[in-house]
Design a protein with these regions (language model features):
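Non-cytosolic beta-sandwich-type ligand-binding/adhesion modules
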Residues: 176
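Disordered, acidic Ser/Thr/Pro-rich linker "stalks" and the adjacent N-terminal cap
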Residues: 1-47, 52, 62-173
């Protein structure tokens, strides 16, 4: 059994759904600063298909505990589509991934929901350098699947920014 929730900044539950194999949740209010989408799973590491926001789509991720996706506000929004986490109706779901999905030929590094704070889902990108610690230059942008590169510094042209540091290093952890 697992659940998906939308929590307020103070930890209060706004919406919750629970299930054995899959869970679907319609969150019917605008997000507020500090809100987060949570996938609660306690068990052996397991692959999930998880969608925290319908504008971003689903991700096939390895889960090793509670996964929290902070709803981005302020500067943090610059690394996301303007449609992400917007509006007053949000379709969220999670389900166990099938063996066929896990074994299929795919981009093994793709995780649209990766973030600095989210250390219980994989793949997970980290770096020793990110330009000015801006969301539009975060390590997560290297694995979010957005490939646009004809401009710079705003979504969809987000990238991993190394700030011209010759010692820059990106690490992608797959959770194994």
């Amino acid at each position: 059994m697992f659940s998906i929730k939308v929590l307020k900044a103070n930890g209060e539950t706004k919406f919750v759904g629970r299930g054995e194999e899959e869970v679907y949740l319609a969150a019917t209010s605008e997000y507020e600063e500090g809100d987060r989408v949570v996938l609660e799973y306690c068990g052996e590491p397991r692959y999930f298909v998880f969608q925290a926001d319908d504008a971003m789509g689903a991700a096939l991720i390895l889960v090793r505990g509670i996964v929290e996706v902070k709803v981005p506000f302020g500067e943090a929004r610059r690394g996301y589509s303007p449609k992400a986490f917007a509006g007053s109706c949000h379709y969220i779901y999670a389900r166990y991934a099938s063996a066929e999905e896990i074994d299929a030929y795919r981009n093994q590094a793709l995780n649209v929901y990766d973030s600095h704070e989210n250390v219980n889902s994989y793949p997970h990108a980290t770096a020793n350098v990110e330009t000015r610690n801006e969301a539009v230059f975060a390590a997560r942008n290297a694995i979010d699947g957005v490939k646009a590169n004809s401009a710079h510094g705003e979504w969809p042209y987000a990238s991993w920014g190394i700030n011209r540091n010759p010692e820059a290093c990106l690490r992608i952890d797959f959770g194994h």
